[in-house]
């Protein structure tokens, strides 16, 4: 066996017959499996112990040798080696075939590799392989040609004409094998290379395809005849098990059935050959053997699949690898682990931010080995066995030991679906009674958890290293910021916001207004004795230190209480001018709390922020309870103006109806006007309602503070529900005039059910689509890791605010903060350098840049990074989750994929109907994001200008045309289809690639017309537009990482003197290296153009075959990799997970591999140094 961390790469190739025999421990000759009486494997059968090893540890088949002392002895009676039964998982057998058969992957795949090598169509090849036609192997002196396919009739005619010995022709895989053996790869390669220079069109494409296959065989050392099998490997029996069920029957893996068919047919064929049976019978048997082997390798690839009982297709070797239940995704990429449990979660408001409540029973089971070891150490038990018994009987001393064991031993909590890395965090367990896990309310946002029956899983990090990583990297207080936008994700929600808002409200004319207190405690006492109201403005003397005389500060009682544990130097108050004022002297709604937490984190870091968060949680819950803010039907007052507004609208609608009937306006116009009228009316009713509700109305407080509900929902409760959409998403022109306070009529209720159901169906679809999008994004970007500090790139992006027309999608501030500059940023007025070259732009600098009106800044960008297999820290910028520069080893690709995929569920699924004009529906929401990342041609294409120049609009009765003329007098004419909306006016100047009509642009056109930078900016802008429209903030750099992966390939147009093949895709780095090498040798470099690949294509085009195979199209990827003899250098993360190595990111990087922990000595030295320092200071 290989030592896991000792090999650097894994290679895949075709197996030669010699290799298969070398793997094998013996030939399987009989189709028998297990003897039904003795239940022992049959000799020379599919489960034979002589070939595959003993079924019981250290025991041979006949029972002559038992016990471990005979280890390695081969029994002289039954021939079984005495060893562990585990070898039945790794020992292989083989079947010697009586006639060669072709391997279906290489004959039937698209394109057919065998067909390309022999230059035959797959159809004629199939006829030969399945004994329906003859193929000429050696034409001799006859008029036939090599590889000519003859029918039965033509063959007999040729024999009559030329005589039986004059030429050689045959059928089946044997003949194909002879032809493959005859191929001279070197000659064929040279021949195809010269043909390539002359051919064009379809012929050229075919030649390129053949050249690819020939090149693959030539370089990999595979021989073409190995695509034909003389001998078949039999996989170890434990991987195709046979188990006895209760009723004495057996359940067996489908593979055994498939192997049995192969063995039966093979044995029959051997017998027929020995008997010298007639040709036609032998031929039929050979065909059946070929079909049996096909079914074993890939059932259902050709013809009807072989079915088992109940017409279920049998699972072949290929099916074992494919799909979600296949070997890759089920067992290699995700495994079930020990030391884990799951239970329902309940809220634990009394917990500290870094704690979670773990049920006692669960903790005892999870920490069993630790408890047992500790019991022995503390002399409660003599040995491990008795300790185990104690734990199982749950003796009282076990609980005390458990308390000790779990102290400072973090556990991981995970909630499925884990959409981003905050779906798994570490906490210190606190033992609780009952069976439910207790969760801190502030981490719910990150987990997207609520307490309506959600379940969570617990995992125990076992090794010291794992515990250290859990504590330093995954503990909840270390994950305060969300990686997608760097904003705090642990902001209080619901009750906590409500309490904080209620606490910081200011009211006039309430009890105790204007009172003056000597200190904070006196004010609290007055409040406790109901002498002063929580919302009253009072004056309190504040002191900075005990000796300070202090100063009277005016604010409300609630705000004094709120500020108790909030650091007083967050930057809301200028402390130089006013050292005594309250830091948070404003109404605290959701946004304000977010700001407070953000400033606290940037200024004081994790620990202080965690303490402050716990305080806000505690006071929030307390005062939302004391405030007793509830809602009842009475809180919803229907505005008096409502009736009047509705009757006005009805009159308007009647007027439009009459105008339509008289033919003054079209139905389309009438519909638009009716919708507009009702929308306006709904708005007016809402405004009236908001004016009716006072600022102290409970419903208003809940919505205004951001705790729960929105203006829209209040409108439905107390205003009017307004317009609803029907099943197709078109707005129904009959509005719902009532609200929930008044109650709906039957018709109104019926109209509103459409939209409600569509919403539910949408959500379900969206979740699945969003998950699949995330999976593809992760796959394309999983090997993007920060590899170095600075790649030294001199290129970057010129960043402006993202605009769509006049509407700002993303401000300049958001786009530059936390990035490195490419050039110096100069002050526009003074001309001095504000930020040097290659420096990070911090918040205050970014604010200053925006304040000075600087419109564009040149920054380093991941799109232009020169690092291979990843990006460098300077091109990436700040790690949003920590707020500091990103470290080498950070898996930024996966973070990018998660940041884009996780909010995907919030995006809508809708297609926006342009009121039926020209039928151009504009895709929005999730499908639009998918369309962009898959680089598909969008629906509703816009016409774009292929020149920079002046526009002239020509309109005739029949058509509209736009003519663009550039400065050299060249012009392009674009016909505008009827119903399209134009974006340009006569005499306007358009840039290359600008849109002439409304709609979406095909990204491939932008790449063709503009350049790589143009298409990069387009995708970033469009993706940002979709997310920002839904109120989701994602940082540009995440999209940049994905776009970089979509554009890192070049399509070779002309190969020149390089080793590259025309028409093939190569990474930009390989292309540049190969060209540099060729130019240095004095040759002609290759010519290639950049291509934009969708994320699925880009994932499959990755250099790692393991990663691609585990993603999609497993058999196709493996077929290609085997022929090319590909080597996987295990650079990305997936490959290493599959192999079972540590991933090469974070602490799994090579540079951290051989670090030895020398803790005790170092700690001792440090303690001594510290003592010396203290002594010196005090002397």
UniProtKB/Swiss-Prot annotation:
UniProt-listed Gene3D superfamilies: 1.10.132.30, 1.10.150.390, 1.10.1790.20, 1.10.40.90, 2.40.40.20, 2.40.50.100, RNA polymerase II, clamp domain, RNA polymerase Rpb1, domain 3
Cofactor(s) annotated in UniProt: Mg(2+); Zn(2+)
Molecular function GO terms recorded: DNA binding; DNA-directed RNA polymerase activity; magnesium ion binding; zinc ion binding
Catalysis: reaction(s): RNA(n) + a ribonucleoside 5'-triphosphate = RNA(n+1) + diphosphate
Record carries keyword Ribosomal protein: no
SUPFAM superfamilies: beta and beta-prime subunits of DNA dependent RNA-polymerase
One Gene Ontology cellular component annotation held by this UniProt entry: DNA-directed RNA polymerase complex
GO process annotations (BP): DNA-templated transcription
UniProt-annotated binding residues for Mg(2+): 450, 452, 454
Pfam families the record matches: RNA_pol_Rpb1_1, RNA_pol_Rpb1_2, RNA_pol_Rpb1_3, RNA_pol_Rpb1_4, RNA_pol_Rpb1_5
Keywords of this entry: DNA-directed RNA polymerase, Magnesium, Metal-binding, Nucleotidyltransferase, Transcription, Transferase, Zinc
Residues annotated for Zn(2+) 2 binding in this entry: 791, 865, 872, 875
Residues binding Zn(2+) 1, per UniProt: 60, 62, 75, 78
Cofactor remark from the record: Binds 1 Mg(2+) ion per subunit. Binds 2 Zn(2+) ions per subunit.
Assembly and oligomerization: The RNAP catalytic core consists of 2 alpha, 1 beta, 1 beta' and 1 omega subunit. When a sigma factor is associated with the core the holoenzyme is formed, which can initiate transcription.
Known role: DNA-dependent RNA polymerase catalyzes the transcription of DNA into RNA using the four ribonucleoside triphosphates as substrates.
Similarity annotation: Belongs to the RNA polymerase beta' chain family.
Name of the protein in question: DNA-directed RNA polymerase subunit beta'
